[in-house]
Amino acid sequence: MVYVISIEGIIGSGKSSLMDQLKRHYTCHQEPLHDWSLLQPFYDDMERYASPFQFQVLFSFHKLYSTIKNVNDVVILERCPWSSRNIFTKMLVQDGFISPQEYELYMSFYDRLAFTTNLHIYLKVDPTVAFDRILKRNREAEKTLQYDYLVRLNHQYEAEISKCDNVYVVDANKPMELVGNTVLRLLSRLCRR
């Protein structure tokens, strides 16, 4: 049976860098940014694209979970449906970008898709550090990203992750090599590799 681990954290927390280290040892699936054609339009116009983009994310996770559900091993994901629902979609509802009716529809799909994540590894990072990393990597889709959004995202993560029983928190303000070594040691203990 598959054991799903999700790497969680705000934008710029080091998820992709960590995944690059982990994929040498484990089956890893990074966020399918190439499948998210609505990501850039969402960043440019959240009001218009919030709901369609969150559905696109949800369906991409459904596709991914369909391919891994029969794997008899550890599979590590860069984010998971939990964060789509509890972090991003909830924030968009709070901001009025997703209506209560759209949220109800989203939740009905989410509940029917029955996603399971066995462990969340949360990369806890100061939004200032994350914003600096975002500026340095200079991704086209993130050029309009605002610091205030990261702060709010961080607050949402802190509030929601504290409700999880199956979470391991890692200080991601440290250099990514140290973060990677910490996570590899954890996974080695958990997975006996």
Swiss-Prot record:
Its EC number is 2.7.-.-. Pfam families: dNK. It comes from the Viruses. Keywords: ATP-binding, Kinase, Nucleotide-binding, Transferase. PANTHER family: DEOXYADENOSINE KINASE (PTHR10513:SF35), DEOXYNUCLEOSIDE KINASE (PTHR10513). Belongs to the DCK/DGK family. This is Putative kinase protein 029R.
